[in-house]
Amino acid sequence: MYTINKNIIVINKPINWTSNDVVQKVKRIIKAKKVGHAGTLDPNASGILVLGINEGTKLLTKLTLDSKTYVAEIQFGISTNTYDSTGEIISKINKFITLTEIESAIENLYKNEYWQKPPKFSALKINGKKAYELARNNISFEIEPRLVKIFEYNILDFNYEKQILKIIIKVSKGFYVRSFAVDLAARINNLAHLLSLVRTESGQFSINDAIEIEQVYDYWNNINKHSTN
């Protein structure tokens, strides 16, 4: 297991937990004064969440987490208001696409940086309020697009009958895979939303460095016991 500091813990966030849920749970388990996280992970996603404990919170901004790697499943033919499977279905299209079309569209996005607009249902702050809170209350607002980049990708599977793509993708900081799914579909005149998402790498950390929430108590006691010897 890779670690740079005893006050940095890498958690394998369970699905249906918010990043803040994990922070508060860990804080209670180890009775820490302060716990923070680097890189929000959507509730519907699982995988790496890097935590700073007490003095470790000051290290979070210094960590090199400029790239993230995800394994994603994308459902074509259906769009939702959240860009993932938790949202309301907005539209459907009865148009099957091919793997060749998908590969061509990804290549066009892959070559250079491109402007990506984050989902309105996100934790980004708009005038001091979280975007998803505004979206849930049907308040009109706009999110500025940001420059993002795909560093690497590999198509793991494409089920033509179900129109589901499974892909591993390494991307820049601030990249939204939900937006990528929508942008990708738009380039081939289709619709899409994200079915599932697992973050397997965050900067220098990999999923192999992560521990389950149930392991936090023993891990914390063990690492602090050794550090005082």
Swiss-Prot record:
Similarity-based family: Belongs to the pseudouridine synthase TruB family. Type 1 subfamily.
Enzymatic reactions: uridine(55) in tRNA = pseudouridine(55) in tRNA
CDD domains referenced in this protein's UniProt entry, alphabetically: PseudoU_synth_EcTruB
Catalytic residues (UniProt): 42 (nucleophile)
Its job: Responsible for synthesis of pseudouridine from uracil-55 in the psi GC loop of transfer RNAs.
SUPFAM superfamilies associated with the record: Pseudouridine synthase
GO biological process: mRNA pseudouridine synthesis; tRNA pseudouridine synthesis
Domain of life of the organism encoding this protein: Bacteria
EC number(s) from the headed UniProt entry: 5.4.99.25
Keyword tRNA-binding on entry: no
Name under which the protein is recorded: tRNA pseudouridine synthase B
An example Gene Ontology molecular-function term: RNA binding
Keyword Cell division part of the UniProt annotation: no
Keyword annotations: Isomerase, tRNA processing
